[in-house]
Structure formats: structure tokens, C-alpha cells
Amino acid sequence: MAFKDTGKTPVEPEVAIHRIRITLTSRNVKSLEKVCADLIRGAKEKNLKVKGPVRMPTKTLRITTGKTPCGEGSKTWDRFQMRIHKRLIDLHSPSEIVKQITSISIEPGVEVEVTIADA
């Protein structure tokens, strides 16, 4: 018995493409930019649609304290501040590929948050 050629090509299973947002936060700008560049380079090697890095406004946390522990003496103050930098990267790809991209070595002090939504 011979098989008939119907002219149809075999149907490949559709891979669900998600909109993936990667949020990076850090106190150190150099390490944050290095991780951003590594993520984007990995995504471009896989021919993914990339938007970003979007530089969000820097949050500056300030604390002002009196220098003397007892409150006596001259009124001198210490001012401390911590700057938190944030970057957003948007990808359009299947979630399996994102697992491969985000498996790169991430600098210490950089926090990574991955949010997946349907495209």
C-alpha cells in the first residue's frame, strides 16, 4: 500500500511566544551595565526581539543623623545616601530560550527579576 502525497507539509508544534520583562537593580552602575550588555548580547545571538535597556530614574535614599551620640556639643550632622539604579529589558521569545539566556554569570550585587506575560 502506497501513501498518497496530500501536498501539505507536516505541521510543527507552535511554540508559545511570551513577552518577558527582565528588571535589573543594583547600587553599582558598572556591574549593572555589564549584566545588561551580557543579557542583550545573548538575546541577539539567539535572534530575539529585544527592547532596552530602559534606564529608570535613580532612587536616592538619604539618612541624616547627628554625629554626637548624647546630643551634647556642637550640632554636627552626618549625611548618608544610597543610590539604587534600575534597568528594564523586554524580550519576545519562548520561555525555554530565556532560561538559557539568564543562565549567564550575574555580577554580585545585581538583583534580577523576570516577569513573563503572554504576547
Curated annotation (Swiss-Prot):
The modification Phosphothreonine is found at residue 9. The modification N-acetylalanine is found at residue 2. The modification N6-acetyllysine is found at residues 34, 75. Keywords: Acetylation, Cytoplasm, Isopeptide bond, Phosphoprotein, Ribonucleoprotein, Ribosomal protein, Ubl conjugation. InterPro entries: Ribosomal_uS10, Ribosomal_uS10_CS, Ribosomal_uS10_dom, Ribosomal_uS10_dom_sf, Ribosomal_uS10_euk/arc. The modification Phosphoserine is found at residue 93. GO terms for biological process: translation. It comes from the Eukaryota. It is found in: Cytoplasm. One of its GO terms (cellular component) is small ribosomal subunit. Belongs to the universal ribosomal protein uS10 family. Component of the 40S small ribosomal subunit. Component of the small ribosomal subunit. The ribosome is a large ribonucleoprotein complex responsible for the synthesis of proteins in the cell. NCBIfam families: uS10_euk_arch (TIGR01046). This is Small ribosomal subunit protein uS10.
